[in-house]
Amino acid sequence: MDEFHRCGKEDSFWQQCFLYPLFFKEDLYAISHDHYLDVSSSSRPMEHLSSNDQLSFLTVKRLIGQIRKQNHSIVLFVNCDPNPLADRKKSSYSESVLEALTLVLEVPFSIWSKYSVEGMNESKSFRSIHSIFPFLEDKFPHSNSILDARIPYSIHPEILVRTFRRWIRDAPSLHPLRSVLYEYRNSTENLQRSIIVVPRVNTRFFLFLWNYYVCECESILFSRLKRSSHSRSLSHGSFPQRTHFHRKIKHIIIFSRRNSLKSIWSLKDPKIHYVRYGERPIIAIKGAHLLVKKCRYYLLIFRQFYFHLWSEPYRVCSHQLSKNCSSSPGYFLRVRMNPILVRTKMLDELFIADLITDEIDPIVPIVPIIGLLATEKFCDISGRPISKLSWTSLTDDDILDRFDQIWRNLFHYYSGSFDRDGLYRIKYILSLSCAKTLACKHKSTIRVVRKELGPELFKKSFSKEREFDSLRFSSKAAARSQRERIWHSDIPQINPLANSWQKIQDLKIENLFDQ
């Protein structure tokens, strides 16, 4: 990729117009093959490794020919192989083709990203879930309604190929992409589906496909939006590999249903906020109920006319924004606005001004979290811990890891709250539920389990908590350190409890529209 960047710096126009010859460079597939071996060797035992893992470019050309002929005897998309030793060689060539295809398609996007980022020094990349809090500080004082939507995760392969034409001028280079997408759609696991479903597979090809698709949805919808100058937001023109979390906007594009996409006008409102976490974009609006209905209506029309998708009405729902509770990132978060007096003065105390502003004060919502824990069978409705019977068939390490993951994500998310008494109550529920689960598995008692495990129970989470506390109270000013908040930003994935809550909310919305 670095070599492609150097070539693109000299002549980026050539790279955009003539990408197809890159598919026939042997070194491209050699790099992809070596990358696959490096990744797969880390997950394979040493006795399975072979010194004969050499790449045959002739075999790669034959495989590409089979893909172009839509030969369904080949297997490019397999989640699990029943016999990895027998199919490892075949799988390595398939992965090399997908890796090489992704590298070629990334060339124009990488060049465009570098030039666009160099001209935008003010752009900042938010890679953490906790970039949601600057959004909350702007949203709560100025918004009264919210649109909760879901990005369509299914799309026809031909529509996806046509969207690539907006960035790639070399039409022949899109033929392999079209063949691969149709091959995936016609594979055994997707035989009954007429549209491609973007999966959550941690491969370079699917990650690039998903990032490009999300960026395309946002860039087209918000191509003429203007950001507020004082916003701490990410520039809209960033590479799709960067996750867009927060963007404050001034205008929203409206598409007329009567004239399809020919008539476009702007609806100006200085208090429209946009944020996305995963596949769930959220638009916070301050305005009349009619404005909210129009935004929801035009969002559905935009998807229907541009992506040729019929979006169910419940995929874009609107509701009044609560002033003391939010669940937009997939977590619950209670807040209260504390007024703060800010005094400013010039030199020699010539001028003094007192400004009153609001400070967001996050609170751990203990009641909703206990309700979710009760739904997932960690405790009863009153908060008394119970054993997780469905996990008793797992090993002790798996049980500890699952409880550790839930507690670590909850602690990292709510560790910046001023009042963490509710967080420690949740820790007590999870730790006792873990002990009861282990006791139920071994047909023993909690006392015996605690005696055997001792400090090993939640050892990883407790060590992170101690690091956090030592970091907080290492300041010289003890009084000020008690008011400091440090938000952790290393959450690798969303909490399973948040997914459970989101499913409950989706079912409620679907039932509401079915009535």
Swiss-Prot record:
Chief localisation class: plastid
Source domain of life: Eukaryota
Signal peptide: none
Gene Ontology cellular-component annotations: chloroplast
Subcellular location: Plastid, Chloroplast
Key words of the record: Chloroplast, mRNA processing, Plastid, RNA-binding, tRNA processing
Biological process annotations from GO: mRNA processing; RNA splicing; tRNA processing
A GO MF label: RNA binding
Similarity-based family: Belongs to the intron maturase 2 family. MatK subfamily.
Function text: Usually encoded in the trnK tRNA gene intron. Probably assists in splicing its own and other chloroplast group II introns.
HAMAP family xrefs: MatK
Name assigned to this protein: Maturase K
Protein source organism: Pinus banksiana (Jack pine)
